[in-house]
Amino acid sequence: MSIELDWTGLEKSFADSLCERLNAALADMDMPTFLGPTRVQAIELGSEGPDVQVIHIGHVWREFREAAVHASSASDKYNARATTPPRMPMRLRTFRQYDDNDLPTSVHGGADADSIASEHEESLSRWSDTESETGTCDSSSLWEEQTRLSDIPSLQMHLSVQWLTSTMRLSLTTSLKIAYNNDTIMSLPISLVVTGMELFAQAIVALDGVHRCVYLSLSEDSTEECAPDGLRAVHDARIRTRHQGQRILPFLALESKVGESAKHVLENVGKVERFVGDMLRQWLEDELVYPHFYTLYL
């Protein structure tokens, strides 16, 4: 089922709000040590809207619900010993990446690619077992009762999103820090403008009425028939965990300026633009491609 978007009817206030949210996310993000503060300066959505189709509607995945329960439990433990309550996190990772003693925003590091791949394969095998009562899409009686009592419905939608645009503009600024013996000896200002892109993704949007939040994640898109769990199995699980950022965002057009405008400026530096594109694709894999996801609280 296709969704018609009045893309050109979106007001500037929507783009400004999106800009603020992106800057809030960037402020909380762990950036590479060689990059200075990064900020989105402006967003223009352009005249070419994405093609969006609903391909699946079902129950909220158990992984999402368990992550919310675990985050709530960790937050309660923190509140019991804190004088002021912590700010509700903008982002959550999957349940299995938490430690019982961590706060909701704590994420384990150091896991190698093989362990991540094995976890993903195990998760994919659970999704394919549609006859199992303990599969990802199961609904416990307690969950069903809580859902009925909530004034917000609980459901999960999978959307096929294809966005080919050359009219959008996203301007951001950052700096390249050059260090010697752990001391920054030089900082080069960098201005970047995204002038076009091709995005092919399956957006996973889960509305959780019990915990009053929305889970957002991405997966690869495909023309293959949708599986009962909502994901389109287009690749072997061992391949699916690698280079997804490149397949989701195969094309990204950038314009760059390196240096201070009052002094010498280098424009359209190819190596910088390729590096930024690779870093953005890696960010997609590390932050948004399932099993990673964002949680927005209502």
Curated annotation (Swiss-Prot):
Keywords: Endoplasmic reticulum, Lipid transport, Lipid-binding, Membrane, Mitochondrion, Mitochondrion outer membrane, Transport
GO molecular function: lipid binding
Biological process according to GO: mitochondrial genome maintenance; mitochondrion-endoplasmic reticulum membrane tethering; phospholipid transport; protein insertion into mitochondrial outer membrane
Membrane topology of the entry: Peripheral membrane protein
GO cellular component terms, semicolon-separated: endoplasmic reticulum membrane; ERMES complex
Keyword Isomerase part of the UniProt annotation: no
Stretches the record annotates as Disordered: 118-142
UniProt name for this protein: Mitochondrial distribution and morphology protein 12
Organism name: Malassezia globosa (strain ATCC MYA-4612 / CBS 7966) (Dandruff-associated fungus)
Taxonomic lineage of the native organism: Eukaryota, Fungi, Dikarya, Basidiomycota, Ustilaginomycotina
